């Protein structure tokens, strides 16, 4: 495919009117490398990479935590329409039985070219600090639990890629030590001081949630 006359995003952040050559979903250097030379006129439009949203609970009156496959598909379609091509639906602090159903929907939802692609699940809660619970329900907050997480990830088909953890909660160090090679540990919803958040081996924390 040739995307013609678009305002193509440049490395320095500017835009330049140019043609873009795409073969099998990848940008190539010239039309000589194309097997399909279908032209798409992008005059007056901006051409830039799809956006990646790794923390979103929902959109258009649907919430990932509704555990509704059709609702999740609607979210994915909306996100794609707004330029987001890769997406991590994000859960809330809820009982285990509900979380298992929620994560199952991410595994089961039908995705096609109209949808943002699910590249992982962001598990925000229940391993939070009640003092910094924010919008999360305190009664469902629990201590970090390795087997709880693994049950959720099994329901999700291994799609949980990010989990929020309050490092001042009992059991957090064991959780991080056991799972830091399986999932990105995100520090968040915590009253911990820097001595607990300090990055060290082997319990590396590589992300922070608000």
Locate predicted features.
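Histidine-rich, glycine-flanked metal-binding segment
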Residues: 1-48
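Divalent metal-coordination and catalytic microenvironments
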Residues: 6, 25, 44, 55, ...
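Di-metal (Zn2+ and/or Mg2+/Mn2+) metal-binding site signature of metallo-dependent hydrolases
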Residues: 45-67
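Divalent metal-dependent hydrolysis catalytic cores, especially in the metallo-beta-lactamase
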Residues: 57, 73-102, 116-129, 156-168, ...
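Generic structural signal for well-ordered alpha-helices
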Residues: 76, 100-107, 149, 176
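Active-site gating loops and adjacent loop-to-helix segments of metal-dependent hydrolytic enzymes
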Residues: 77-88, 130-157, 200
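Histidine/acidic residue-rich metal-binding segments in metalloenzymes
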Residues: 142-200
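Single conserved hydrophobic/aromatic residue that forms the stacking wall/gate
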Residues: 197-210
């Amino acid at each position: 495919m040739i995307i013609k006359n678009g305002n193509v995003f440049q490395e320095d952040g500017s835009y330049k009117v140019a043609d873009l050559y795409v073969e099998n979903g990848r940008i190539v250097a010239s039309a000589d490398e194309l097997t399909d030379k279908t032209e798409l006129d992008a005059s007056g439009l901006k051409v830039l990479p799809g956006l990646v949203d790794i923390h979103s609970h929902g959109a258009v009156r649907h919430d990932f935590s509704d555990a509704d496959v059709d609702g999740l598909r609607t979210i994915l379609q909306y996100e794609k329409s707004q330029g987001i091509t890769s997406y991590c639906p994000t859960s809330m602090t809820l009982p285990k039985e509900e979380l298992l159903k929620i994560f199952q929907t991410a595994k089961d939802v039908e995705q096609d070219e109209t949808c943002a692609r699910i590249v992982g699940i962001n598990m925000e809660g229940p391993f939070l600090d009640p003092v910094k619970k924010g919008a999360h329900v305190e009664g469902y907050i629990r201590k970090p639990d390795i087997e709880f997480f693994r049950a959720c990830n099994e329901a999700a088909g291994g799609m949980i890629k990010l989990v929020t953890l309050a490092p001042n909660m009992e059991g957090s160090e064991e959780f991080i030590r056991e799972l830091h090679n399986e999932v990105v540990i995100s520090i968040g919803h915590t009253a911990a001081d820097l001595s607990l958040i300090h990055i060290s081996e082997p319990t590396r924390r590589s992300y922070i949630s608000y």
